[in-house]
Amino acid sequence: MTNVVQETIGGLNSPRTCPPCILVIFGATGDLTARKLLPALYHLTKEGRLSDQFVCVGFARREKSNELFRQEMKQAVIQFSPSELDIKVWEDFQQRLFYHRSEFDNNMGYTSLKDSLEDLDKTYGTRGNRLFYLSTPPQYFSRIIENLNKHKLFYKNQDQGKPWSRVIIEKPFGRDLDSAKQLQQCINENLNENSVYHIDHYLGKETVQNILTTRFANTIFESCWNSQYIDHVQISLSETIGIGSRGNFFEKSGMLRDMVQNHMMQLLCLLTMEPPTTFDADEIRKEKIKILQRISPFSEGSSIVRGQYGPGTVQGVSVLGYREEENVDKDSRVETYVALKTVINNPRWLGVPFYLRAGKRLAKKSTDISIIFKKSPYNLFAAEECSRCPIENDLLIIRIQPDEGVALKFNCKVPGTNNIVRPVKMDFRYDSYFQTTTPEAYERLLCDCIIGDRTLFTGGDEVMASWKLFTPVLEEWDQDSSPSFPNYPAGSSGPKEADALIERDGRSWRPL
């Protein structure tokens, strides 16, 4: 255990300085680039993590000059960066920011891109290192991957000391198991699997990174992290927002594909996996896959339910139902809410139920993990004065957003002559304790990819294991031509079916 902890501290928390490289963002005019990627790159530059040998090239279909692209990205940084724009830093950074216009399947576009990258290599000393970020709709992934290989933009021979090339793939990685297998086959034929980084931005969040440290660096937690002491676990991911302008995207995905199959499964794996032999990306991945392979199959109604929001009021504002949103079918059967119950069939978690829920247009925005411990077996507090305040289950809450931190709720005697017991809470918050701004997830993930650290990235085998679980559910839903939608009002805590899912076990959801 000591080795794991030491490597955790040395691996996840060691200072990172990125080597020279060119980052090519496919889909550079999209929302992700403006909201997340460019602000992250700007902040890494401001912090001195990216040198003047780093270059960024935006690749997209719209006609645009370098100057216009830089102006648009400057406005994006001003709008979405958590810190105020430093003009001097930006002026330096934008000189290494370029735009390349092409269709994603145009041979000439890739030929001219290759020429441009070679020129930039010479000008900025990027040593031939290339990072390609696929921030496009998923239907373009295979075309781009094939063209990277066809035009020799990706190096298949990446021996130590030679220039490297890597590819970051955004979710969704396929729509189901078959499409994920097809995309994986395309990767196997054109790239090297160990140079492909499947990005899940939840893994870049500070509190998510802290899950393994909380577990394996603290005997007080790891010793009771099992079915002997834990009654059940709840993972909640609630959003107050709807789908906004993403109607076309969400109609093709839904909540299960968008959040559950990836983000929530990663949280579940980190929470439940066995300690890896070393804190190495491959060893961590092996343990996560073991968890995915031991999850029982889901069945509609008994272990997984879905919902869709109707009109309602969110934080005092009247909002439309999902079917009234822009670019959404008026009879849409797409789910905006998923709740499920699962068990993990291994000795550590035998008999412990895990309840997961994720939804849009709910009453509150929050993502947290609640570990509810079993009550003490000792019946020492049954006297009349104690019965007025029943003993509650101890509770560990890992808050991922907002107010990142960890809280422990336990029972304590109230001062006085009567033997009255009440729950109290110890609350750790990142911002107040460390007195520093928590880094954005994409800052960490981009930096790790440039360095070549795969620890916080998922692998293709993980993705397949997750799709194997959920593809039967999606197929069953596709056969249901008339689900009872909408089945929860916007601004609520979700559909009644989700409450029934957990209440039939004599439990209830924690308040959002």
Swiss-Prot record:
Substrate binds at H201, K205, E239, D258, K360, K365. NADP(+) binds at R61, E103, F104, K171. GO terms for cellular component: cytosol. Keywords: Carbohydrate metabolism, Glucose metabolism, NADP, Oxidoreductase. Residues 496-512 have a biased composition (Basic and acidic residues). It is an enzyme of class 1 (oxidoreductase). The active site is at H263. The keyword Oxidoreductase applies. SUPFAM superfamilies: Glyceraldehyde-3-phosphate dehydrogenase-like, C-terminal domain (SSF55347), NAD(P)-binding Rossmann-fold domains (SSF51735). Pathway: Carbohydrate degradation; pentose phosphate pathway; D-ribulose 5-phosphate from D-glucose 6-phosphate (oxidative stage): step 1/3. Belongs to the glucose-6-phosphate dehydrogenase family. NCBIfam families: zwf. PANTHER family: GLUCOSE-6-PHOSPHATE 1-DEHYDROGENASE (PTHR23429:SF0), GLUCOSE-6-PHOSPHATE 1-DEHYDROGENASE G6PD (PTHR23429). Catalyzes the oxidation of glucose 6-phosphate to 6-phosphogluconolactone. This is Glucose-6-phosphate 1-dehydrogenase. It comes from Chlamydia pneumoniae.
